[in-house]
Amino acid sequence: MTASYLPSIFVPLVGLVFPAITMASLSIYIEQDEIV
């Protein structure tokens, strides 16, 4: 088993997960700011 396929999966995963977490945290912060 070679790990040569890991970067091709890990890079897009980080590129999708990191912005998703950022957008989610921003939306939660904005919603809490509007409620308070």
Swiss-Prot record:
Function: May help in the organization of the PsaL subunit.
GO CC terms, sorted: chloroplast thylakoid membrane; photosystem I
Entries under InterPro entries matching the protein: PSI_PsaI, PSI_PsaI_sf
Classification lineage: Eukaryota, Viridiplantae, Streptophyta, Embryophyta, Tracheophyta
Database matches in Pfam families: PSI_8 (PF00796)
HAMAP family: PSI_PsaI
UniProt superkingdom: Eukaryota
Gene this chain is encoded by: psaI
Family statement drawn from the similarity comment of this UniProt entry: Belongs to the PsaI family.
GO BP terms: photosynthesis
Membrane-topology descriptor: Single-pass membrane protein
Record NCBIfam families: PRK11877.1, PS_I_psaI
Name assigned to this protein: Photosystem I reaction center subunit VIII
Bilayer-crossing regions: 10-30
Compartment(s) of residence: Plastid, Chloroplast thylakoid membrane
Keywords in alphabetical order: Chloroplast, Membrane, Photosynthesis, Photosystem I, Plastid, Thylakoid, Transmembrane, Transmembrane helix
